[in-house]
Amino acid sequence: MSKEYSDVDDFASDEEEDNQVLITGKDAKKNVIQFDQEEDEEEQEEEDEEVQDEEEPEDKVVQLTEQQIEKEKQRRLKKLKSDKKTKHKTGVVYLSRVPPYMKPAKLRQILTRFGEVDRLFLKREEEHKHQQRVKSGGNKKTMFEEGWAEFIRKKDAKLCASTLNGNIIGGKKGNFYHDDVMNVKYLPGFKWADLTEQIARENDIRQAKLQLEISQANKLNAEFIHNVEKSKMVNKMKQSKKRNQQESQQVDEEVRRTFKQRKVASTRASAPDSQRQSQPQSKALNDVMHSLF
């Protein structure tokens, strides 16, 4: 099994309950069962015709060289491989649970016991689950949650579903997957094209949601940047206005001289007591007074 099938993103398994292709009503189931029975009858008739063709005697055999015979064999083998899918009705089975750490090659080997498997698709676990398991010290191997397998013959798909569903894988007792229980369901009326169409549809929806989230994030970022720039511009305008006001106040301010008001004094006898100033006595008078006392 190539890696490309296991790495492709798949739709969530919870949405399969709403999918009318996988789960149908009673009337739809009757129609599907009748359709399957008709396909089985057609397939059985084709197989009977092939057996009759093989049993017919080869009366018209032409003598050919060994090289020509070998080329004819190769041509018939290629034609048989290309026509095998068109001759037989394919059948698809759904695996709701894949044993832990089982690789697609191992699962293909198990399913091949019941018939030839054409295509196999397994859905990987989500990345955050894998990282959480590894971070907590768990196994680093890749796990698959669910899958789909397409058998070349529809009867092989039915046999696989009826045999493996609810039973252990078995095999040798020492096998790592001996006791793992398989959950397999045959999907009547379901073809591989339906699966790929739904996967493409789910991928388109996921991509549209992603684009919408990206556009919303870009819009929020642009609005945030615009608000930041506007805030800076408003702050600069306020600072400039404040600076201009301070400069205008300094220019308009008048220069005023201040004078110290002296106390009014008078030596006149008629002056009031609050303004009267006593004259200092002479030095000679002070000396005489000092000598007397």
UniProtKB/Swiss-Prot annotation:
Keywords: Nucleus, Ribosome biogenesis, RNA-binding, rRNA processing
Region (Disordered): 1-68, 234-286
A GO molecular-function annotation: RNA binding
Basic residues composition bias: residue spans: 234-243
Keyword Nucleus: yes
GO biological-process terms attached to the record: endonucleolytic cleavage in 5'-ETS of tricistronic rRNA transcript (SSU-rRNA, 5.8S rRNA, LSU-rRNA); endonucleolytic cleavage in ITS1 to separate SSU-rRNA from 5.8S rRNA and LSU-rRNA from tricistronic rRNA transcript (SSU-rRNA, 5.8S rRNA, LSU-rRNA); endonucleolytic cleavage to generate mature 5'-end of SSU-rRNA from (SSU-rRNA, 5.8S rRNA, LSU-rRNA); small-subunit processome assembly
Taxonomic superkingdom: Eukaryota
Main localization of the protein described in the UniProt heading: nucleus
InterPro entries listed in its UniProt record: ABT1/Esf2, ABT1/ESF2_RRM, Nucleotide-bd_a/b_plait_sf, RBD_domain_sf
Bias type Acidic residues, positions: 7-19, 36-58
Described function: Involved in the small subunit (SSU) processome assembly and function, and in the 18S rRNA synthesis. Required for the early cleavages at sites A0, A1 and A2.
Similarity comment: Belongs to the ESF2/ABP1 family.
Protein known as: Pre-rRNA-processing protein ESF2
Provenance organism: Kluyveromyces lactis (strain ATCC 8585 / CBS 2359 / DSM 70799 / NBRC 1267 / NRRL Y-1140 / WM37)
UniProt lineage: Eukaryota, Fungi, Dikarya, Ascomycota, Saccharomycotina
